[in-house]
């Protein structure tokens, strides 16, 4: 069984082709700068050389046609016939309260996705474009939607309600949703395998630390709390996002700086986080290098990030009444020993202790705890694309 996985952004389309008999990746690639001058495709067949094709790509429908051509090409393709694809799995950022799991996409689902656009105006439209392009290029092939928010739909009301008039939840669905759900779900499953215990018997805290970052509390395989909220802006200080802050800062900045609400929103999403704090970069490697050279703002910025992650882990230890393991994943979580060490430094009270030698690992599944740690600390590379393919396969009953 072969499944195509699609992840559409506003000007990009990333894809992978899976052979689900052994979960091997047959090919992967991306089309960048859709609708912008200088668009191109990078295609990488398994065991083959990367192919780059520069071509004007006007929209997502044209981009999807390029993907179809690439994966069926006689020279660098991996399929003899497009009919070998039995399903297309789509990453969808926001499913609102409509979706607590993955679904086969029909007209009702498409209408529901349209109704969620106001909750994710930047992310959901390109996700929808990708689905429409896939349906146009591959009519009759099942399309499966896998939602970043779905995994967190098991959160109880005490975790997702905001302390604002209840009517806004009833009228506008204003609540905490959480994101990175596919990643949190995948690494929790892998952690259970690594620990040799059923997921249903475990209490886990998963830390997805990349340019976007979130922490989740998982009890018996279900999300019970997570750091992101109505949008991905809430929670941790991130690459360019502010994370949680006093909401009155918004009006304060509007008054003091003469800014519009849209300008403040842009600042909080694209000019804040470690970029805004440091004034240097949203790349932690740059910040670590600057801090090592004595840059005080870079050093302070790193400390703010470490501190906020540690605080969320601490709060979720309380929510779960302890945890069996802390899991680090995504770009920073998988590849930065210094981040993992700094985040866990003040958590020894909870039996969380990192072995400095084991912690030097990058991008590999590893238990980095000391032998006497009562709470394990794991590094688990995420694989959201494989999780989407598995969800699609499961829905087709194969």
UniProtKB/Swiss-Prot annotation:
GO terms for molecular function: acetate kinase activity; ATP binding; magnesium ion binding. NCBIfam families: ackA. Pfam families: Acetate_kinase. The keyword Iron-sulfur does not apply. The gene is ackA. Mg(2+). Can also accept Mn(2+). Homodimer. This is Acetate kinase. Its EC number is 2.7.2.1. GO terms for biological process: acetate metabolic process; acetyl-CoA biosynthetic process. It catalyses: acetate + ATP = acetyl phosphate + ADP. The lineage of its organism: Bacteria, Bacillati, Bacillota, Clostridia, Natranaerobiales.
């Amino acid at each position: 069984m072969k499944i195509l996985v699609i992840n559409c952004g506003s000007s990009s389309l990333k894809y992978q082709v899976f052979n689900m008999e052994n979960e091997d990746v047959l090919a992967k690639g991306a089309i960048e700068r859709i609708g912008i001058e200088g668009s191109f495709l990078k295609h990488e067949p398994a065991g083959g050389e990367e192919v780059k094709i520069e071509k004007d790509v006007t929209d997502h429908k044209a981009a999807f046609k390029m993907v179809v051509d690439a994966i069926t090409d006689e020279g660098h393709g991996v399929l003899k016939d497009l009919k070998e694809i039995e399903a297309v799995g789509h990453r969808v950022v926001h499913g609102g309260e409509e979706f607590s799991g993955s679904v086969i996409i029909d007209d009702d689902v498409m209408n529901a996705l349209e109704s969620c656009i106001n909750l994710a105006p930047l992310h959901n439209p390109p996700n929808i474009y990708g689905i429409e392009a896939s349906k146009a290029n591959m009519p009759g092939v099942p399309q499966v939607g896998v939602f970043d928010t779905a995994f967190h739909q098991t959160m109880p009301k005490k975790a997702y309600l905001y302390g604002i008039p209840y009517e806004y939840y009833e009228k506008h669905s204003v609540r905490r949703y959480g994101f990175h759900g596919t990643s949190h779900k995948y690494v929790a499953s892998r952690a259970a395998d690594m620990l040799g215990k059923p997921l249903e018997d475990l209490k886990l805290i998963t830390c997805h630390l990349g340019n976007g970052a979130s922490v989740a509390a998982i009890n018996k395989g279900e999300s019970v709390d997570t750091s992101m909220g109505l949008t991905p802006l809430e929670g941790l200080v991130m690459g360019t996002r502010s994370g949680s802050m006093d909401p009155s800062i918004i009006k304060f900045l509007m008054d003091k700086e003469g800014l519009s609400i849209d300008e403040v929103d842009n600042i909080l999403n694209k000019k804040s986080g470690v970029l805004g704090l440091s004034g240097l970069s949203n790349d932690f490697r740059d910040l670590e290098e600057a801090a090592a050279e004595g840059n005080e703002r870079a050093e302070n910025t790193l400390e703010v990030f470490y501190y906020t992650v540690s605080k969320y882990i601490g709060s979720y230890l309380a929510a779960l009444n302890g945890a069996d393991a802390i899991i680090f994943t995504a770009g920073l979580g998988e590849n930065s020993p210094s981040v993992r060490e700094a985040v866990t430094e003040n958590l020894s009270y909870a039996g969380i202790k990192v072995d400095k030698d084991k912690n030097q690992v990058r991008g590999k599944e590893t238990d980095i705890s000391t032998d006497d740690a009562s709470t394990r600390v794991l590094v688990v590379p995420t694989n959201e694309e494989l999780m989407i393919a598995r969800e699609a396969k499961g829905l087709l009953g194969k």
